[in-house]
Regions:
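A general structural signal for well-ordered alpha-helical segments in protein cores
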Residues: 42, 46, 113, 130-134
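Conserved small/polar residues in nucleotide/adenosyl-binding loops
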Residues: 147-153
Length: 153
């Protein structure tokens, strides 16, 4: 099993300490997702983390920080949909349809597909995929399910 955490959209007091603790206790990868954060804010946050964890962090914003801090890579999304010119590192992407997965998965190390579950933070943002749809997409080789449960039926 891989433990991957996506940060909350806003910085919070004690976040660097919490992230450090997560890494110390088995976190494999952190997706640093701070929409609207400046390069300075993101850099200040990264400077609070031990350097040994930088190669396990993927940034969703301020892609130039990937090379400055030696981050694992970048994550493409609706706000930042293009790989920067000349970038050769790790790339992941958010996809919101199986068609998007098919279009982008060959250009990425991996993709996130959502919404799989009803959102607890976005009102009215409901699951877009039945278990059957996901299983068929897996059988067709479109996606790789990391976790399935019959309890969801």
């Amino acid at each position: 099993m891989k433990l991957i955490v996506i940060t909350t959209p806003q910085f919070f007091e004690g976040e660097a300490e919490a992230v450090t603790s997560l890494f110390q206790n088995g976190l494999e990868m952190l997706h640093l997702r701070k929409p609207g954060a400046s390069a300075e804010e993101m850099g200040n946050f990264l400077q609070q983390l031990p350097m040994e964890y930088m190669p396990r962090i993927v940034t969703h914003e301020q892609f130039q920080l990937a090379s400055v801090f030696g981050l694992k890579g970048i994550h493409l999304n609706g706000r930042n949909p293009q790989i920067p010119s000349g970038y050769k590192g790790h790339v992941s992407r958010s996809c919101h349809s199986l068609e998007e997965v098919l279009k982008h998965k060959s250009d990425c190390n991996y993709v996130f597909l959502s919404p799989i579950y009803d959102s607890i933070s976005k009102e009215g943002y409901s699951s877009a995929y039945s278990c059957d749809t996901l299983q068929k997409a897996q059988q067709a080789g479109i996606i790789c399910l990391l976790y399935t449960s019959d309890a969801a039926d």
